Amino acid sequence: MAKMTTLKMKEKLEKELQAPNRQFSYNRDNDTLTVAQNGKKVTLTIPQIIANFENDGNAAVEKIVYYVEEGFRAAAGNVELENNKASIYPVVRATSFPDETKAGEALLTDDHTAETKIFYAVDLGKSYRFIEESMLKKAQLTHKEIREVAFNNLANLEIPLKKDSVNGNDFYFVRTNDGYDASRLLNEAFLREMREKLTGEMVLAVPHQDVLIIGDIQDNTGYDVLAHMTMDFFADGLVPITSLPFVYNNGKLEPIFIMAKNRLKE
């Protein structure tokens, strides 16, 4: 099979995503393709898509197309917060994630860690719509009320764990693909429960929105394995968050750097 190049992938994406009232712009310097429709934009990083394509074939492109189409559908819909309280959840993103829409509307956010920020979204089934500050006034709801509703809904989500072990270090994975796997990092009751269960240092990672990794780290090998896993997930994720893991101590999350086979403390 001929090697997939940036230009070939660009053409393939444009063909798959072609639709009325939709425009494409290619940034040669950054190898990104921006898809615009009715004032909304989605920017795709082509080298990342090619890497996924080499592993998963056309399924990688189909996933991107689905992600873009659902994103535009969500952006186009009018969402009433008052009638959708049961569908509001907190969403974890990188601190570098834009805190306003392309139209300049401020998104509802809360600070979290030096690496992560909390956004709020209304679940629409196959996608979700970020909540804008202006939507609160229309719904006559406060920031605090949205936060409480979102975290209560999060607490009701199941947290199935898949376990893997490497040289005495245990790793637990949350991968339900419901859009809120990384959000479970915000479930404090769950974190406390895991802390009581684990015997080593508790280290967590949210490399992208569809995975939460919890490590029961016993030695340097455990840190090394976690660092490699986190980087791999970060590179493969459609919505990357952070490649830095967090140590959980005394109810607090602290980002740490892990290099080679040694843990480097802050």
Curated annotation (Swiss-Prot):
From the record, what ranges are coiled-coil? none
What the entry lists under InterPro entries is as follows: DUF1444
- Pfam families associated with the record: DUF1444 (PF07285)
- Domain of life per record: Bacteria
Q: Mind telling me which NCBIfam families this protein's record contains?
A: PRK13668.1
Q: Which family does it belong to?
A: Belongs to the UPF0354 family.
Name this polypeptide is given: UPF0354 protein Lm4b_01619
What lineage, starting at the top, does this entry show? Bacteria, Bacillati, Bacillota, Bacilli, Bacillales
